[in-house]
A protein has these predicted regions:
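Small/polar-residue-rich segments within soluble enzyme cores
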Residues: 1-43
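Conserved, well-ordered alpha-helix/loop/beta-strand core segments that scaffold catalytic motifs
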Residues: 30-74
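Beta-lactam-recognizing serine transpeptidase/beta-lactamase-like catalytic domain environment
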Residues: 24-37, 50, 81-133, 137-253
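Generic short beta-strand
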Residues: 74-77, 87
Length: 253
């Protein structure tokens, strides 16, 4: 195999070649085996956790979502949260592995020059921001550190104004950050913040909010807990070229 699971388990799947001395006729046809020097050893089988039906559904759903968002590439992964088994994994755009067996044509090569890199498994090789799933990290860290209690209420008006550190007294220099729900979610506790995926709640939980003197986690504690959750390190998935990602810190920035 040249990629994916087949590349990872090439030594297991390949087996061992046999060796014979044979007699051939003038047309190259084998007439008889003169000597059997070594019998071939078949390779072992590898059983995957992938669910074929779920894999098909995931690919169809991802294609539909990419079309709706007018996005040129996307990833979908379905896992068993109890075991970590990967039940479906889709990376688009993609390519056909069999091309490497049959021979790469000029048109194949030109198609692979797509800037969205179809030869890359974006599910494991890209390093991208985690998005709203990171709210679970912030929520857990804030509760563990006592920044939040289960009863703490933070208000979401749909946006938060962050003062410019170089012009703290000039409101015109402040930077607004918006919640996905621009109407706001109002006052809510951490369960509500997670249930609504409220951006402003976690802006405040992570960075604090000067108007109410609320002290958030801060960059270093967020980074510490991100690493405790395993971010910034390879997962060890049995696929080649996995990216470990990056947990940014104040020093890194």
């Amino acid at each position: 195999g040249t990629a994916g699971i087949e590349a990872t388990y090439e030594d297991v799947l390949r087996g061992e070649k046999g060796e014979q001395i044979v007699e051939e006729d003038v047309l190259g046809r084998v007439r008889r085996v003169v000597e059997e020097r070594a019998a071939p050893v078949p390779g072992d089988n590898v059983h995957l956790s992938l669910d074929l039906e779920l894999q098909t559904v995931a690919e169809e759903a991802l294609l539909a979502s990419m079309g709706e968002a007018d996005s040129p590439r996307g990833v979908a992964i379905a896992m068993n949260p109890q075991t970590g088994e990967i039940l479906a994994m889709v990376s688009l755009p993609t390519y056909d592995n069999n091309i490497f067996v049959e021979g790469v044509t000029q048109s194949d090569w030109e198609r692979w020059q797509d800037p969205h890199r179809p030869l890359i498994n974006h599910a494991v090789s890209d390093a991208v921001p985690p998005g709203s799933v990171f709210k679970v990290v912030v929520a857990s860290a804030a509760l563990q550190e006592g920044v939040l209690t289960p009863q703490t209420q933070l208000n979401c008006s749909g946006r938060i104004e962050v003062p410019n550190r170089y012009y703290p007294n000039d409101p015109g220099q402040a930077q607004p950050f918006y919640c996905w729900n621009e109407a706001g979610h109002g006052a809510q506790d951490v369960v509500g913040g997670l249930a609504h995926s409220c951006d402003v709640f976690f802006y405040k939980a992570g960075g604090g909010f000067e108007e109410t003197s609320f002290k958030g986690l801060g960059v270093e504690r967020i980074a510490e807990y991100a690493r405790l959750f395993g971010l910034g390190e390879p997962t060890g998935v049995e696929l080649p070229a996995e990216s470990g990602g990056l947990v940014p810190t104040a020093d890194w920035k």
